[in-house]
Each structure stands twice: as structure tokens, then as C-alpha cells.
Amino acid sequence: YLCCKALQDVPAFACRIRGENVVELGEQKPSFTDLKKGSELFHIVTMPCEGSIAEFCERAREVSGKQDCFIDMAGQADDLIYFSCLPWMDVTAVTNERELLAPNARDDSIPRICWGKYILENDRVYLGISVEVNHRLIDGVHIGRFAEALTRRIQALK
């Protein structure tokens, strides 16, 4: 939720390449992996990032619980943000699956965000986050702005 909101704070993350054009989207939807209780098979949940953090989490629980397929293809479009989490290990980088031989692979501009296990060290919490983007649209300055926005949003939880 906070990552999605922080990405929405940086307009460059809303840009997508469509043919010869770059468009700026309005709403972007998180599309994330989830494990059903008692299973090691994950599925991909896609839903709007709406309401408060508590409302979003409750809605995500409902949507995930009712989903009976690996991925609902009806909700798949380029207005997504892909999220994944590896809470079992600290991560410094993650590479996501991409169809590099597809004709429009170079235009894939859906951001992919992954984080791992947080580390507590000297009374500070560290969390490695991997951010994959299309460099034709997003540069280091935008990723830095995302990191700053995410930090502000996390600190506002206190």
C-alpha cells in the first residue's frame, strides 16, 4: 500500500509506452503475489489501491481469499505496478521475469517492485528494495524521489 502510494507521488512512474507514444496514466493498480493459508502455491492478486491502509489490507484479504485461479487475466493491462516480497531473506537486487523476445518487450514500462526481509541493526530498521523500470522513462532521480516518498509515508505511520 505504502509503496503504491509512494509511486503515485512520482509522476514518471505513471508513464507508459504505447506504440510511438508516451502516456501518463491516472490510476495504477497494484498486482501482487500472495500465498493462500496452508499452501505454497502463490497467486497474483490485482486490485485498486483505495481507502486507508487498513481498508486496503482488508479488501486485499477478501479478494485473495475469493480468487480461485493463478491470475485473473481480465484485470491485466499496462496500468499495473507489479509487487513481490521475499520476507525470508534480505535482498539487494531481484530480477523479474520478462518476455525479452516479444516484439514489444522494449516498451514494457510496468514498474516492478520487490522487497525482502527487514533487518534490525543498531536500533535501525533496514529494508532492501529492488526497483525495475524502463530506463527510457525513469531514471535514478525518479527512483530517489520514490525512496524519499516511501520514507515519508513510513515515518508518517508512527
Give the residues covered by each predicted segment.
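Active-site-proximal acidic secondary-structure segment that organizes catalysis
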Residues: 11, 54, 107-158
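Hydrophobic "lid/gating" helix adjacent to the active-site nucleophile
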Residues: 1-30
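Acyl/amide activation-and-transfer machinery of modular secondary-metabolite enzymes
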Residues: 26-51, 126-132
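Generic non-transmembrane alpha-helical segments
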Residues: 2-10, 63, 149, 153
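Short, conserved, surface-exposed binding loops centered on an aromatic residue
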Residues: 22-24, 34, 72-75, 105
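Short intrinsically disordered coil segments
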Residues: 46-49, 97-102, 128-130, 146-148
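Helical lid/core segments from catalytic subdomains that handle acyl or acyl-like groups
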Residues: 36-94
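Flexible, Gly/Pro-enriched loop and linker segments at secondary-structure and domain junctions
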Residues: 71, 78-85, 90-126
